[in-house]
Structures are given as structure tokens and as C-alpha cells.
Amino acid sequence: NFVPPYSSGAMEKLEKAGAVVLGKANMDEFAMGGSTETSYFGITKNPWNMEYVPGGSSGGSAAAVAANMAPYALGSDTGGSIRQPCAFCNLTGIKPTYGSVSRYGLMAYASSLDQIGPIGKNVQDCAEILTLISGTDKRDSTSVMERPFDFSDSYREDLKGMKIGIPINYFGSGINHEVREKILAGAGVLRGLGAELQEFEMPGIEYAVPAYYIVACAEASSNLSRYDGIKYGFRSKNVKDLRETYYKSRSEGFGSEAKRRIMLGSFVLSSGYFDAYYKKALQVRTMIKENFNKAFEKYDMILSPVSPTAAYKIGEQISDPLAMYMADIYTVSVNLAGIPAVALPCGISDENNMPVGMQLIGNNFSEPALVKAAYAFQQVTNFHKRGGIL
């Protein structure tokens, strides 16, 4: 029942435009997770099938929209936390260019990766919300857009002349065969709309997940150090002195996944391991950005999976953190590079009758082009119109 003392920059803009705030949605603790199973408040269930996870970390936002509790929602995307829930819940979501939407009021997980974006039933709804929340904010030093996005030229069905790259190594042995087939079928739809598709090799994907978790956890260990029970956050009641206040407040106030990432971040930032891990991760991050830059010299955008599988059952991965981390393999590189991506539905799995999503990745501030491609796709398909059991 906590009521925030102030609104975020994104919410201020929505309320100014007349939006009605229905409530706060469940999510993984401090955005650390991909299923909402790490949430302090309990697990959110996927409206398509209550035995399955809705994705995360913004799983509550996605579930609310999928269950028709709200026409749209906001989420935060640090390594895929908007796009993966959209893929699992048959929704559309936009992870905007870093700096295009104010992070003022967003509880920081990894400050150089976090970005707020919309979740909705279709890309036009998401684009309208992104128009409202994008633009400059002096309270966020990373805010770089002087004007909001303009999508007025994006609502066309003709993609003639648009060049889309397909990184063929993204579709190797690690991806579920049905997910691969649905996404490649979606590529065929884009080709039918006039887009030129070409396969290519995107180097460096094997380094994306370890580099991401080193950078993200390092920043998290710093950002979450403020939760000490004195200056900020939960305070344990049964304490004898200041030291015990710090110790018990942090021990009792953080869940196991948050503790794991804080410890990992503290480890890679320590003097003995800084060069061996953190410095190398930053070098990999630069390499990933350069690889995207080279790809965008040839292609207007890249078509990629969101997740190697469709949604999985509750409890299947929570005991195996490494498996959960590796599920982010297709999304984290976008955050490391700071570029935008749109996730949208492209089919239903025959194995478990759960949704399958794909993503379109673009260069900095290419959201209008991404929306154009996604809009054209959704005009000739009905995947986004299908609903689950609710």
C-alpha cells in the first residue's frame, strides 16, 4: 500500500495527457529476474495459461494488459524486461533508445542499461504512448531527446526498399525449433510486404550474456548500497546497534536473487578482479556496439528472436539461475548497445499453445522505422489479436 512521494517523469507526462493511473504492477524484485518468481509479493501468472510464467521482470505489466485489466502499461527494460514478457504474453512492446525517455523516478537497477517503455496489444498503441513519454527531462542527465518521437509517417503497409538483416547464428542449436520456424515465417511476411531480407553473421553473441551480467550486477551493487536501513529502504526492527541495523536490514530486506547479483557485482568491482572481469566486460560492450554499427551500415533493422523458447512453467527455471540468465541471450545486447527494439507476436507454439514473439532491432532513434515495419506486419497478420484463457 506504499504511495510514492512523487511521480516519475514518464508518469507525469501521461497524467498531463489525461491518463488514468489504475495501479502498480507486480515485477521481479528490483527488476532482477525473468519470470516474476523473485517478486516479494508472489508470482504473477500468465493469462494464457495459469501454470506458466508471464516473463519478467515487467511480468505484472504484461499480464495486466494480456488479461484486459488495462489497455497499456509501462515497463522497464534493462536486459529484456519489456520484450520478453511481451513475447510470453502475446503482446507488443518497445524498448526505446537509451536516453529517449526520462528515467527520473525509476528505481535504478543498472543505470547505463535501464530504459522505460510501453507495453500494449499492438504497435500503434505502443507508439502513441511512446510519443507521450519521450522527450527531454532536465532531471535526468541521460535524457538526450529535445522533442518526442513522431510516428505520423510510420503507419503504412508498404515496406518496399526496407532492408532487414537476419543474423543466422541467432537461429542455431540453442533455439527451440518451433520458435525458429515461427520467426522465419514472420520474416516471410515482411518479405511479402516488400522488405529485402538478407542473412548475415552477427559476431559476439556468445559474449553478450556474461558481459551483460557483469556490467549490470556491478552497477546494481552500487545502486542498491543505499538500501541500508538508515538512509533508505527497509529497516529491521529487532536490532541492538548501528552495525546490526545495517546487517539485518540488508539480510532481511533483499531476496536471494538480489543478494546473488549484489555479491556478484561487488566481486567483479573488487581490486583483485576489476581488470579480469569488469574491464573486459566493458570492452565486450564496446565490441557489441561496433558490431551493431557495422550491421546498420547494410541494413535498416535486424530481425531476431526475443527468447529461445516460449513461456515455461512456473518453477521450471527458478532453481537454475544460469539457465534463466542464458534465456536473455537475444535481448541483452540491445541494452548493452543502447539501441531500440520492438517485440511483437508472430505465432503460437504447437507444443504448449503459448505465444511466440520476435523482435525488430534498429539503430539509435530509429523507432519510427521499427514501428513502420511492425505496423505493416500487424496489418496483414492477426497474431496480436489472439487472446489466452482469460
Describe each PLM feature range:
Residues 6, 175-182, 326, 369:
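Conserved alpha-helical elements of sugar-nucleotide-dependent glycosyltransferases
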Residues 1-78, 185-188, 193, 289:
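Gly/Ser-rich catalytic/binding loops embedded in alpha/beta enzyme cores
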Residues 177-179, 209-218, 313-319:
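Short glycine/threonine-rich loop-to-helix capping motif typified by GTGT followed
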Residues 22, 196-201:
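General small-molecule cofactor/ligand-binding pocket signal
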Residues 26, 170-172, 205, 228-336, ...:
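Serine-dependent amide/ester hydrolase catalytic core
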Residues 12, 16, 67-73, 78-174, ...:
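Structural helix-boundary/capping segments
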Residues 41, 211-218, 355-365:
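Short basic, glycine-rich beta-strand/loop surfaces that mediate nucleic-acid
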